[in-house]
Structures are given as structure tokens and as C-alpha cells.
């Protein structure tokens, strides 16, 4: 059987940026990497209800900058910014350097693979039929302007004795075209029958200008957000 490469990993440096952006000496590299993983796990656990899509960690000289992309910024920030201040202190203790936390709102959660996967997994945990959950998520994404979307679920679907996987697709999802902007994510639904895995691929269009266009678009959206 053929194995598919991770759609995000194969596009790094082509049209996708890394989620950890820093340089380290050889002796510090493993320590920093482990620290990043621990911080991500801590934030994912702490902000489980905040619909967190992505966490970007940057390490400029002797401090750290963490950008949390979320569909519910209010939950992360908390009343008068209390929650985000507490979060900053805790993460700073973990990393051993001063930490600055930025919150970026995800304006279209139906077009974010991780949030779609979380949503489908949440429905499966609430015992919604898996086909209905997949179909609803696919229709919402296509309505929001996705060029194509594929959702796959695998496990003891509907409480069946034998585990299997099923998928639903609409539109185009070109995994081999490197200039294709494919957003990919996985998530787990913990049901009474066991764990059901959810995979989501969303095709948002082609990026013809490579990394230069990605950075230009990012800069433009940043200016728009600051206005």
C-alpha cells in the first residue's frame, strides 16, 4: 500500500512557513526543540476550548514571541486581559526567558483544517453520526470559498466491531501539486468505543509566487489587521 507524505511537511520552504522560527547552536538545538514541544502541549491543553488553530514560536535574542491563532480570542485574553497575563507568566517560567504573546483571530474557522478537524471530532464525541458530521463540515467549507476539501475518519465508526476508515470529498484536492495551498490537520475523537482519528485536507487555491508571495500576503494582512 502507498503511503502519503505529510502535505504540510513537503511544502515547507516552497509555500509554507515553519511554526518554530529560530536559530540555535548545535548544543542548544535539542533543548529548544523539546521546550517548543512542551510549550505547545501546555498551550493546547490549557486552551482546549479556545479553538486554537496554530501556535508560532519565535526566539529573537534572549526572549520569545508566541503567536496564537485562534477563532475565539476572547477566551484566550480573558476578562481585562487577566488570562493572557497569567499564560505569559507560566510560559515564561517554562522557557526561562521573557515571553511576549500575540493573539491573531482566525476569521474563517470553516476554512481552517485544524478547527474543522476539532469540530468533527467534537461532534463524534457527542454521538453525532460520522457521515452527517463530515458532510456538514464539507458543505460549510465549500460555502466559505474552499476550492476543495476532503475529510477522513477512521476507527470503530458507529460502534462497529471492526475498525474501518471512510472519507468524503468535494471539489479538487491536488496533493502532488506543490504550489497548491493545502491546509492539513489531524485530530482525535475519544468516544466510548475507542479513539476515532479525523484527517482534514482543505485546498484554498494555488500560490504561484512561492515564499515571496506568502510573505507579502502575510505583511499585507498584518497591516490590514493593525488598521
Curated annotation (Swiss-Prot):
Query: Does the record's keyword annotation contain Thylakoid?
Result: no
GO MF, any single term: rRNA binding
**Please, which domain of life does this record's source organism belong to?**
Bacteria
Does the keyword Ribosomal protein belong to this entry?
yes
Any single Gene Ontology cellular-component annotation: cytosolic small ribosomal subunit
Print the keywords alphabetically. Ribonucleoprotein, Ribosomal protein, RNA-binding, rRNA-binding
Q: Biological process GO annotation list? A: translation
Specify the KH type-2 domain's residue ranges.
39-107
| InterPro entries attached to this UniProt entry | KH_dom (IPR004087), KH_dom-like_a/b (IPR015946), KH_dom_type_2 (IPR004044), KH_sf_prok-type (IPR009019), Ribosomal_S3_C_sf (IPR036419), Ribosomal_uS3_bac-typ (IPR005704), Ribosomal_uS3_C (IPR001351), Ribosomal_uS3_CS (IPR018280)
Describe its partners and assembly state: Part of the 30S ribosomal subunit. Forms a tight complex with proteins S10 and S14.
Family of this protein: Belongs to the universal ribosomal protein uS3 family.
What exactly does this protein do? Binds the lower part of the 30S subunit head. Binds mRNA in the 70S ribosome, positioning it for translation.
The family database entries (HAMAP family) matched by this protein are listed as:
Ribosomal_uS3_B
Q: What is this protein called?
A: Small ribosomal subunit protein uS3
Q: Which organism is it from?
A: Marinobacter nauticus (strain ATCC 700491 / DSM 11845 / VT8) (Marinobacter aquaeolei)
Amino acid at each position: 500500500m502507498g503511503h502519503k507524505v505529510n502535505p504540510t511537511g513537503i511544502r515547507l520552504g516552497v509555500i509554507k512557513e515553519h511554526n518554530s522560527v529560530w536559530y540555535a547552536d548545535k548544543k542548544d538545538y535539542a533543548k529548544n526543540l523539546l521546550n517548543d514541544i512542551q510549550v505547545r502541549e501546555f498551550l493546547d491543553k490549557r486552551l482546549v476550548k479556545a479553538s486554537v488553530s496554530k501556535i508560532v514560536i519565535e526566539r529573537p535574542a534572549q526572549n520569545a514571541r508566541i503567536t496564537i491563532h485562534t477563532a475565539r480570542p476572547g477566551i484566550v485574553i480573558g476578562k481585562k486581559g487577566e488570562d493572557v497575563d497569567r499564560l505569559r507568566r507560566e510560559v515564561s517560567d517554562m522557557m526561562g526567558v521573557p515571553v511576549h504573546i500575540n493573539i491573531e483571530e482566525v476569521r474563517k474557522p470553516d476554512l481552517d483544517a485544524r478547527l474543522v478537524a476539532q469540530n468533527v471530532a467534537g461532534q463524534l464525541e457527542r454521538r453525532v453520526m460520522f457521515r452527517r458530521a463530515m458532510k456538514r463540515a464539507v458543505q460549510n467549507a465549500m460555502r466559505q470559498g474552499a476550492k476543495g476539501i476532503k475529510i477522513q475518519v477512521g476507527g470503530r465508526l458507529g460502534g462497529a466491531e471492526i475498525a474501518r476508515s471512510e472519507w468524503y470529498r468535494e471539489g479538487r484536492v491536488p496533493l502532488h501539486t506543490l504550489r497548491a495551498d493545502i491546509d492539513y490537520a489531524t485530530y482525535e475523537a475519544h468516544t466510548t468505543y475507542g479513539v476515532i482519528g479525523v484527517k482534514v485536507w482543505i485546498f484554498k487555491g494555488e500560490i504561484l509566487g512561492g515564499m515571496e508571495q506568502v510573505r507579502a500576503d502575510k505583511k499585507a494582512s498584518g497591516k490590514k489587521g493593525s488598521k
